[in-house]
Amino acid sequence: MSTVSAALIMFAVSSPFTSIAKSAEFFSIGTGGPTGVYFQVGNAICKMVSKIQSAEHGRKKGTDKAYRCSAPSTGGSTYNIGQIMQGELQFGVAQSDWQYHAYNGTKPDKVKPFDGLRAVFSAHPEPFQIIARKGSRIKDWNSLKGKKVNIGNPGSGQRGTFEVLMESHGVDTGYFGSTSELTSSEQSGALCDKKIDAFGYTVGVPNAGVAQSTDGCGAYIIDLQTDPVKKLVSDNPFYAFATIPKGTYKTSKKDVTTFGVMASVVTSAAVSDELVYSVVKAVFENLDDFKKQHPAFANLDPKKMIKDGLSAPLHPGAVKYYKEKGLM
C-alpha cells in the first residue's frame, strides 16, 4: 500500500464525512519528514478543513461539496512541487526559494520549471541550520572540511539549500570527508550515534528532530555568517538572515545567526478555485486553532501570510477569499 493511499484511509476513518464518501472530493497535501514542521503544516490544514466542514454541514447532513484531506509524509519541497506538476498532489508545502525557482525556471537541474505553480499562503520562517555533534570541533563553515556531513535526501529542501550553500562557497561534496543522504527523520539518530559529524536542516524553530540531537546528545547549531552567505542574502529576495534565540534548545547558550526562507503552501493553476477557496477559508477562519498546532506557527499574521515568501502568483481561489475578507 502506498504512503498516500494509507494516509487517505486513516483520515477517512476519523473524518466526520465517512458517511458521505461517495460525494466527497479527495485531495492531498505533500509535506515532509514525519518529524519535521512541514508534516505538522499539512496535518494542521487537514484538521482545519475537517473542523470547518463539520461545523457547517454536520455529521448527518451531508453535502455535495465535502472534501476529504490527507497529508502524507513526502520527500519535501522539490518533490512536492514535482508531484503537484504531475497532478499527483493538489497542494504541497515548499520552501520559498524552491517556489521561486520552480515558477521562474531558474534552477532546472534542481526543480523542473513549472509556470502553472500557484501560491496559496506562507507559513512559518525556516532558518537553515547546521547542527554539529558534540566533540566534533566544528564551530563554523570552514571547520566542516573533512567531516562526515549529511546533506539531506534528494528532493528535499534541505538538500537543495545545502547544494546552494556549497556552490556559493565554491566547493562540492569532496570538501567534506564523506557525505550521506539521510532523511530528516534519520539524521539526528545518526549524529548521536557518531555516524555523522553534522547535518544541515531547513526547518521551523523549535523542532523535535533538532531537539533529539541537541537535548539528547549535546549537539549544537553553528553560526553561518560567511561572506558567501551574506552575498546569497543580498542577491536573492527569498532569503533573509534569521536568528535562533538563546535558550531554544538545551545547548543554545547564545543567539545563533544564520539565513533562511519561508515555508509556503503551493498548488497548481489546474486545481479548482472552489477547493483552494475552501482550504484557505478553513485555515484563516480557524487561525487561532491553527497556531496552536505547533510552536513555529505562534506568530502567524494573516497580512504577512498572503505576501511574505510568495513569488508565484496567488491562486484565484485564494485571492477571492482574501478580497472578501479585506486582506487585499
Where is each model-derived feature located?
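C-terminal segment of classical bacterial N-terminal signal peptides
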Residues: 3, 9-20
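N-terminal (or domain-start) structured segment
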Residues: 22-95
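Extracytoplasmic
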Residues: 24, 66, 76-79, 86, ...
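Bilobed "Venus flytrap"/periplasmic-binding protein-like clamshell domains
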Residues: 26-58, 126-193, 288, 304-308, ...
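Acidic, polar ligand-binding/catalytic clefts
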Residues: 89-124, 204-208
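Pocket-lining segment of extracytoplasmic ligand-binding domains
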Residues: 96-98, 106-107, 136, 172-266, ...
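Ligand-binding clefts/hinges and TM-proximal coupling segments of bilobed small-molecule sensing domains
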Residues: 147-164, 237-307
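An extracytoplasmic/periplasmic, membrane-proximal ligand-sensing/linker region
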Residues: 186, 193-194, 203-217, 221, ...
